[in-house]
């Protein structure tokens, strides 16, 4: 960027510290039970941050970041799962329309705008989203983020987790929570079967299930 805009070195300012004291980072091994771990974690966060509130306007919010839009690990399916199991108003946000969605044409763009506006207005407090969720959204009461899998890069983790704790006054004494759910790779045999061209379709499905692939 410095080169593109011909900015001299004297005008470049580099922060000495990149950490944010209002954020607390945690990496959890979900032992291959990612969905169950997510449900438990969201319940814990709701109990921690929203116990005793009388309205959505008082609530702290959370974002679950997913690597994909579709399938059971995508933001669309996870929003439905969280809503069903936890009895909460949970919505999803993605750049592209989910394959399962019935919205067509401009209706999906209208949906995305409403989801974003309602989230900023505290009309609901839990959102599942891909990285498409706008960096320009400055919502000050996000108390936790959860990455449903390893982020694409450390920069992505820092930017997405950084949606939390925007109001330093709210999170000085108790930092906002930023979680990453990961599964340690210990399924060498199952992976070998998946890549073996001689593996039958039924065996391929069994191996994929072991790895929680869909």
Identify the meaning behind each predicted range.
Residues 1-49:
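Interdomain hinge/linker at the junction between the two RecA-like core domains of SF2 helicases
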Residues 35-133, 137-214:
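C-terminal helicase lobe
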């Amino acid at each position: 960027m410095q080169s593109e805009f011909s900015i001299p070195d004297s005008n470049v300012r580099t922060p000495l510290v990149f950490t944010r004291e209002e954020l607390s980072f945690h990496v959890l091994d979900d032992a291959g039970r990612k969905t169950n771990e997510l449900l438990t974690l969201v319940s814990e966060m709701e109990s921690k941050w929203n116990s005793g509130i009388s309205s959505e306007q008082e609530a702290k919010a959370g974002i679950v970041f997913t690597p994909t839009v579709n399938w059971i690990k995508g933001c669309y399916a996870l929003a439905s799962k969280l809503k069903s199991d936890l009895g909460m108003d949970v919505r999803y946000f993605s750049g592209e329309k989910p394959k399962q969605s019935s919205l067509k044409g401009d209706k999906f763009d209208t949906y995305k705008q409403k989801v974003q506006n309602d989230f900023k207005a505290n009309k609901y407090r839990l959102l599942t989203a891909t990285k498409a969720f706008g960096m320009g959204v400055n919502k000050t009461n996000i108390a936790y983020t959860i990455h449903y899998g390893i982020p694409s890069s450390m920069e992505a983790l820092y930017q997405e987790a950084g949606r939390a704790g925007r109001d330093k006054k709210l999170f000085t004494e108790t930092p906002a929570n930023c979680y990453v759910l990961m599964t340690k790779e210990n399924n060498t045999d199952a992976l070998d079967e998946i890549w073996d061209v001689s593996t039958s379709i039924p065996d391929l499905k069994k191996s994929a299930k072991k790895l929680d692939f869909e």
